[in-house]
From Swiss-Prot:
Phosphoprotein is among the record's keywords: no
SUPFAM superfamilies: DmpA/ArgJ-like (SSF56266)
Subcellular location, record wording: Cytoplasm
Pathway: Amino-acid biosynthesis; L-arginine biosynthesis; L-ornithine and N-acetyl-L-glutamate from L-glutamate and N(2)-acetyl-L-ornithine (cyclic): step 1/1; Amino-acid biosynthesis; L-arginine biosynthesis; N(2)-acetyl-L-ornithine from L-glutamate: step 1/4
UniProt binding sites for substrate: T149, K175, T186, E266, N397, T402
A Pfam family: ArgJ
Protein family according to the UniProt entry: Belongs to the ArgJ family.
Protein name: Arginine biosynthesis bifunctional protein ArgJ
GO cellular component: cytoplasm
Enzyme Commission number(s) from the entry: 2.3.1.35, 2.3.1.1
Keywords in alphabetical order: Acyltransferase, Amino-acid biosynthesis, Arginine biosynthesis, Autocatalytic cleavage, Cytoplasm, Multifunctional enzyme, Transferase
This protein's record includes keyword DNA-binding: no
Amino acid sequence: MSDGEEKPDGFSFAGIAAGLKDSNKKDLALILAPENSICSGLFTQSIVRASCVDICEQRIKKSSGLIRAILINSGQANACTGDYGIQHTLFATKEVSQLLGINEEEVLMCSTGVIGIPIQIKNLIDNLPNLVKELKTNSLQNAAEAILTTDLVDKKITIETFIEGRKVKISGFAKGSGMIYPNMATMLAFLTCDVGVDKEEWDKMISIAVKKSFNAISVDGETSTNDAFIGINSGKKIDKKFLSKIQSGIDIVCQSLAKNIARDGEGANCLLEVLVEGAKSNSDAIKIAKSICNSSLVKTAINGCDPNWGRIISAAGNSGIDFKLDFLDLYIGDFQILKKGKLNKYDSKKVANYMQTRMNGKYLVEDIVSISLHLNSGSEKGTAWGCDLSKKYVEINSEYTT
């Protein structure tokens, strides 16, 4: 596993500053895939959507997934911008296709930033030639930086494995910090893989990975207009019996990026990891874990290092999943709080100290507050991730457009 510059064979990445942000930071990225690449995408479930989301879905469907390039801008979401939004997306993708010498229908576009603000289209178009030239540099790092908005850190990962003596690489990069909620959290994420997989199989693999990762995170319960996860594969095909190994790799990449997004929640001090075990189904377990991660009362208790277990149980009860309180075991870290639904003897000061230590721990290593809920009603389990909710979150979002 690496967060360096290793990349899947045949793919090129670029990221530059095009003047779309006042900060002069990188704000325009491009991914170029080999010919005959296969693409799958999952997008926001909000009925209020940016035009680029609709265009992405239409082009993936119309081309049966034969996509060559993805243009990504940050700074303006280009959502709720009427005909301008559609025209700007179509104009930009057409220019990219001409510069790359490919079909316009093979180009997707994703945008992120302030809703209601049109793209600074002149700056974008004027800088496209430079962006295409930067593909020669082939920097995954630059692309990862260019899609960020309120993120504090970039989010990228590459993993390698060997199948039949062949090195296989899967890379991913993402953005997301605020407006994060399960079911395609407010985020953009892109995955590339240098193994060829048929469209139908690839759709299934992407859907499985997203269910266990991006659809299992929450920062603030808000869903965006621009959410997108796009995965592209290209390369020599492998025996189908090895597809499970590719699935495992995709799962690792997606979960790593999802946890990075949750940890980088606006104003967050720790990652919250909730494991639900002993459920009747994986789906039930994830729903309960999500409900706990999404509870503002749980998140503020975590921020205050308050082992308020009642909030955890209450959030689980609001999940819509049936379970018996008398069967429950609850742990915060290694401390058992409930045993068969009844309060267990524990030292609240030690639990609070555990939470405080995690709040100050090393980033994504020792800063994880773990909650485990054992339903003792089945054999399935599921995990969701979130973060604490701090005063800093309010400060950031009360001043976002000013």
